[in-house]
Design a protein with these regions (language model features):
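Catalytic center-proximal scaffold of phosphoryl-transfer enzymes
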Residues: 1-65, 105-478
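An N-terminal low-complexity regulatory-tail signal and nearby short nucleic-acid-interaction modules
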Residues: 65-128
């Protein structure tokens, strides 16, 4: 059988042996297959992946070397730099593994202790000087999904990102730090280019809290520390973090798309609400016909935070926020507990079903149910340490103006805050409440923000902006 000649430019000659090794692996497998013997295709998959990775690494080596300069003096963005280290080898980290590249290092002229510049890393947009941008992006994506040790194991199994758990941890938080530092600007840019789904008719804004295990310093007991006592005693405590959603709904109140937000307990919930309000303003600029509603549980803190933003312009205008609702299922939960006190066991379900029906179809139902709770005369009945009827009365009294579910249904608006409830579970519980896990505020904030991007289908667009390489012009100085 005749061979096909592949011409490779001399400057890319390093690829020849790697490509030949890949061809040889495939040819060997083809020859073995034609003999009709036993085939271990899984082993072939691994071999071809290894050889393909070698081709990839050689390609990176050649391309990165082309970014290098080695002149004694260069102009970098019109600033004179002199060489401080010539033709020294370093390793850049790619998706396929480490790549050795020779490069020179430079320092601004006249600055004895000025920052050292690596032209290759600068031009390639390497994160932290050695991690190639796509590699850093994917490592951060892995760590927002799972622990760094699981990411390490996955990388080794797949033959991609073959790095240690410490490297995954370091790179993910480096990317997280870079994103968090500019997240407001990036979120603004993302919402400006967002295309509102054609079928969107309303937008709901929700806010909730979720507990997160935190690592905090523990006070030492008085007296001299016991032998073997930890030098830095800590304790694992739960603090309440915040999550929010902006959800677009169709003509039936069903969710079309949700933007998810989060911040740690020591974060900035007011800033989170400001960001959500800003996104809704942009959505209204694109679609002024969208109906805006606020939807969350009955916690006063949540409503105070939302109202601080959604009573300002443009939301202060009459009719701009068409509904403010307590989550329907939180209300039913309160009523269910009260019904078990008021009614006989066989009447609990019919009574609760009646209340549900009335709330969904009659605007005055909330007042009628409140009166029924009062008339039961069982406000002081204890169930364990709770007074279910008293709690339901208090809930209805404090939130009656946020329970007009019948009016919301007539406008085809949602009445349940399931989107933010689900966000609390997927954003925090799934990733941050693993057995034995504990978090610090700064690094936890990195993961929360990165995970919110991934869950909102905004990862690539956000990383394009967060890891965007600065424009670099390098010229050899005369």
């Amino acid at each position: 059988m005749a061979n096909i000649v592949l011409e490779i430019p001399e400057e890319l000659s390093g690829l020849v042996s790697a490509v030949q090794a890949l061809v040889d692996v495939v040819k060997t497998e083809v020859d073995r297959a034609r003999t009709g013997g036993a085939v271990d295709y899984a082993a072939f998959e691994r071999r071809i992946a290894e050889k393909s990775a070698e081709v990839e690494k050689v390609g990176h080596q050649i391309a990165l070397s082309a970014l290098a300069v080695s002149a004694p003096q260069v102009m970098i963005n019109k600033v004179l730099h002199h060489r401080v280290l010539a033709e020294t080898e370093t390793r850049f980290m790619s998706l396929a593994g480490a790549v050795a590249v020779k490069r020179s290092l430079y320092r601004p002229s006249g600055q004895r202790n000025g920052p050292v510049v690596d032209p290759v890393a600068l031009r390639a947009g390497a994160v932290d000087g050695v991690w190639l941008p796509a590699t850093a992006r994917e490592m951060a994506f892995e760590v927002q999904q799972r622990t760094s040790r699981e990411a390490e194991a996955s990388g080794k199994r797949l033959g991609r990102l073959p790095y240690s758990h410490a490297s995954f941890e370091h790179v993910a938080h480096t990317v997280g730090e870079r994103y968090v530092g500019q997240h407001r600007q990036i979120e603004q840019a993302l919402i400006e280019v967002f295309e509102v789904p054609e079928g969107a008719k309303s937008v709901s804004v929700s806010l909730d809290r979720v507990s997160v295990p935190m690592e905090e310093p523990r006070s030492r007991p008085p007296g001299r520390p016991a032998q073997g006592a930890p030098k830095r005693p800590i304790e694992r405590v739960y603090r309440m973090a915040y999550c929010g959603t902006v959800t677009l709904h169709d003509e039936h109140g069903e969710s079309l798309y949700t933007i998810r937000y989060g911040t740690m307990a020591a974060g900035d919930p007011a800033g989170l609400c400001e960001g959500m309000a800003g996104d809704v303003v942009e959505l209204l600029a694109k679609r002024p016909d969208l109906k805006v509603m606020l939807l969350c549980d009955g916690a006063p803190e949540m409503w105070n935070l939302l109202d601080a933003e959604f009573t300002k312009e443009p939301f202060g205008a009459a009719g701009k926020v068409v509904a403010r609702l307590i989550d329907f299922w939180h209300v039913i939960e309160k009523l269910g507990a009260a019904a078990r006190v008021i009614a006989a066991e066989t009447e609990v379900k019919p009574l609760l079903a009646s209340w549900k029906m009335r709330l969904c179809n009659t605007s005055s139902a909330r007042l009628a149910i409140l009166e029924q709770l009062h008339e039961s005369g069982k406000e002081d009945v204890l169930v364990g340490h709770d007074k279910p009827v008293h709690e339901a009365i208090t809930y209805f009294t404090n939130n009656a103006e946020r329970m007009d579910y019948a009016a919301a249904r007539r406008q085809k608006l949602p009445i349940g805050s399931g989107n933010v409830e689900a966000t609390g579970k997927t954003l925090f519980n799934v990733r941050m409440k693993r057995s034995g896990s504990r978090w610090k505020s700064r690094t936890g904030e990195h993961i929360v923000h990165l995970r919110a991007l991934a869950l909102s289908d905004r990862w690539d667009a956000a990383m394009d902006r967060a890891l965007k390489s600065p424009r670099v012009v390098i010229r050899v100085a005369a």
